[in-house]
């Protein structure tokens, strides 16, 4: 399920859409990831190892590795403390897998699923972004106002960024790993942190719109992404069912707003930067801000998902992959 364990947003499994042909529905890949009662569990994250030709799906209880050619589950591993939204190293070998809002992350071997190291000392582990250099991992603890940075050579925390105005929720980083764009509890807006010094640089509030109750996640702006060219920041607004667009260059001018059909709680982009994928199920043209279509499954049911990733194939194998997070890609 793309949102919690609700089957009304596209059902169970991995849904495949053809980006080159109008995002038409292609197929549904069968997955595991079940609650103890046998019903589909909440999907917490999705990530790809191009090197291993595998896609990984985390649920509340487990992590699955699925071969992208055979579309078969290679293994499913249960983890003590559960699983949350993970991230994989650029070489496709190592994963940082948060526990389910417990006090630790597991560093996991992507080939075997074995735990390499446990990193503890947190309150509620949740979101994870592996930096483009492969040297740092950015870790969001939703019980702390800090964004944590781990050194991947030692798997030890080497920096805290913040403190921010509230507990850190979804965030993103630029390609050069100098800036972090962070959403926090209670703020309809985002904050900016310096990933080298650890200092908070800016706090931005959405102008012209009021906060209100949201059905999921509890914070007003659950979802933020950088366009791949790093020119813009797209911010989710659940209550007002909007995407707010900002310049990604200080002073981060608010540019426009785009209405959605449901409460967006996540956003990512295509690798080429042409398409935005909010979790409410629309495909948005980044340049024109127009909603091009709404994703539908094989039964013509509306599809919504907070776990979306682009994969490019050649001769049946993955050659390039995007990210569930809308991370910067400007080199």
Q: Where is each model-derived feature located?
A:
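Predominantly soluble domains enriched in secretory-pathway, periplasmic, or organellar proteins
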Residues: 1-331
């Amino acid at each position: 399920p793309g949102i919690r364990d609700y089957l009304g947003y596209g059902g169970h499994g991995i849904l495949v859409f053809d980006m080159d042909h109008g995002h038409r529905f292609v197929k549904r890949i069968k997955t595991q990831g079940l609650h103890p009662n046998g019903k589909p569990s909440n999907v917490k994250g999705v990530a790809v190892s191009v090197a291993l030709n595998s896609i990984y799906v985390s649920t509340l209880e487990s992590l699955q590795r699925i071969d992208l050619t055979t579309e078969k589950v290679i293994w499913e591993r249960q983890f003590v403390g559960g699983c949350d939204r993970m991230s994989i190293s650029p070489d496709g070998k190592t994963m940082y897998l948060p526990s389910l809002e417990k006090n630790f992350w597991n560093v996991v071997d992507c080939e075997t699923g074995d735990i390499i190291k446990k990193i503890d000392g947190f309150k509620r582990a949740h979101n994870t972004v592996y930096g483009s250099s492969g040297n740092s991992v950015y870790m969001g603890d939703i019980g702390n106002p800090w964004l944590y940075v781990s050194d991947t050579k030692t798997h030890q925390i080497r920096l805290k960024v913040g403190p921010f105005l509230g507990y850190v929720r979804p965030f993103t980083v630029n390609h050069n790993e100098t800036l972090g764009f962070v959403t926090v509890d209670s703020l309809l807006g985002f904050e900016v942190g310096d990933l080298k010094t650890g200092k908070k640089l800016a706090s931005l509030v959405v102008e012209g719109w009021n906060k209100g109750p949201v059905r999921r996640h509890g914070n007003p702006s659950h979802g933020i992404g950088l366009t791949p060219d790093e020119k813009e920041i797209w911010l989710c607004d659940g209550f007002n069912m909007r995407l707010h667009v900002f310049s990604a260059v200080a002073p981060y001018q608010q540019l426009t707003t785009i209405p959605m059909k449901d409460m967006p709680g996540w956003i990512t982009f295509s690798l080429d930067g042409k398409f935005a994928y909010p979790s409410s199920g629309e495909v948005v043209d980044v340049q024109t801000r127009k909603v091009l279509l709404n994703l539908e499954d094989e039964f013509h049911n509306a599809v919504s998902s907070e776990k979306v990733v682009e994969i490019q194939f050649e001769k049946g194998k993955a050659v390039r992959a995007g990210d569930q997070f809308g991370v910067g890609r400007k080199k």
